[in-house]
Structure formats: C-alpha cells, structure tokens
Amino acid sequence: VHGAIKDAYAQACRVIDIELNAVTDNPLVFPRNVSPDDEFDPTVEETVISAGNFHGMPLALVMSYVKNCIPVLASIAERRIAKLTDPATNDGLPPFLIGNEDGTDSGLMIVQYSAAALVNDLATRAHPACVYSVPTSANAEDHVSMGANEARHVLDMCGDLAHVIALELYTAAQALDYRRDMLNAARALAKQGDWALIAARISNPPAAEHPSRAQFEREVSELMRALADSD
C-alpha cells in the first residue's frame, strides 16, 4: 500500500514539475526568427497560437489523486492504534494501554476514537473537486478545473494525516514502555524461579500514569511538529 502511494506521489511531483516549467499564456506568441531557446533561427516564422495551456486540470487531477492517498495512509495508522489498544490483538498488553482493570480509567481509548474520527473526516474530504466544474467569466471559462480547491484540500488533509500519525506514535511509545517494563519484570522475577509469580506479574502490569489533557495535547503537538520538520 505504501509503495502504491509513493508511486502516486511521484506522479504528482512529475506533473507539478512539468506545469511549473510550462508556458501558460493564451495565446502563445512566437516572434519571427526566434527559437524556443531565444536563438536566431531562420526556419522559425512568427505565429500566434491560441491554446488551452492556462487550464489547471493537470494539477487538479494529480491533487485529487493525492487526496485519495491521504485517508488510506491514515486508515492504516488508525488500525495499528486499534490493534495496540485492543487486548484481543495486542499480544498481552493491558487493555487500552493503561493497566487499570477497575474501570476507572479509559486509557488510550479516546486516542483511538480521535484517530477514527479523523480518518472518517479525511475519507469524506477525499471526494474530487475537479469533477464539479462551474463556469465562470460569463461562460468564457466554461470548464473550470477547481484545482485551487483540490490543492487547498490536500494542504488541510496533510495536517490531519500528521495528527493521526502522531497519535499512532504516542500509542506505540506507550506500548513500548509497557513491553519494556514487562520484560524487565520477567527478567528480575526469573532469578527467583517463581513461575506463578512471573505469570501473574506479566499479565497484570502496573497502571500507567494517565497524562493530563494539556500534557497529552502538548506531546501530540510536538510529535506533529517533528513530523513536519522531518524529510
């Protein structure tokens, strides 16, 4: 899946490079005896060509392509969060990664809720804008790409994708802390040879300290900034 998305991203970059280096005027005016390289060429005749090079559909289509990739990446990240917080699939880690079985703390359950909500919102916004052309300029521009809307959607959606990935990193860090503590406890208890005690200790890890909302939001924001600063 990630490979397919990398290919889609590469295609978008290729089209963007072409458009950045393309002539978008209309009409295109070619002076006599001047080649595209601004060198004298006696075979070139002066001419004016009316063309649709101004149209933004090449960019609009690849932006729509990228929009479809974003919720796919986010969905995969959310599924990993769900697997880590579900005791049926997290390979012995405590439910919702909190180690509290008395029901007084929901742990990282709401983290998965947040990721699920973001994935749903991203999937909703992935619908292409370029298929809804609305004529402008007294119908002189009777087919409009809406490429600017597509690009704006991509920018906004990338921020939400980073949010989902930050939530996954936060969850993974909590899971790793538990796994490390459980392994350390197992190693320490193994020296005593009390296997019943070892089994009980591993299956009932101590409750983790639940961060305050402000602390949680600060840490997730720091993860998002780190993602934005990375290559």
Stretches with model-predicted labels:
Residues 1-231:
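C-terminal auxiliary extensions adjacent to catalytic cores
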